Amino acid sequence: MAVPFRRQSKGRKRRRRSHYKLKTPTIVVDPQTGEFTLPHRVTPNSGYYKGQLVLAKKVKKED
């Protein structure tokens, strides 16, 4: 089995790991409800996308 010829330095190891970071998600405000949502997605509560109603909410029947 192969073994590394030399030990990697701390700087080389840290430079490689510098890309292992999390990105913060982009959040936009829904104009209909004022809630924070992800961009380019239908908002689950209002059902609007680009100002048009895409998903109609189901109304529960009360007895």
From Swiss-Prot:
Swiss-Prot/TrEMBL GO biological process terms: translation
Keyword annotations from UniProtKB, A to Z: Ribonucleoprotein, Ribosomal protein
Domain of life assignment: Bacteria
Listed GO CC annotations: large ribosomal subunit
InterPro entries per the UniProt record, alphabetical: Ribosomal_bL32, Ribosomal_bL32_bact, Ribosomal_zn-bd
Covalent S-S links between cysteines: none
Entries under Pfam families matching the protein: Ribosomal_L32p (PF01783)
Entry keyword annotation includes Ribosomal protein: yes
One of the record's GO molecular function terms: structural constituent of ribosome
Family membership: Belongs to the bacterial ribosomal protein bL32 family.
Protein name as it appears in the record: Large ribosomal subunit protein bL32
Lineage: Bacteria, Bacillati, Mycoplasmatota, Mollicutes, Acholeplasmatales
Protein's gene: rpmF
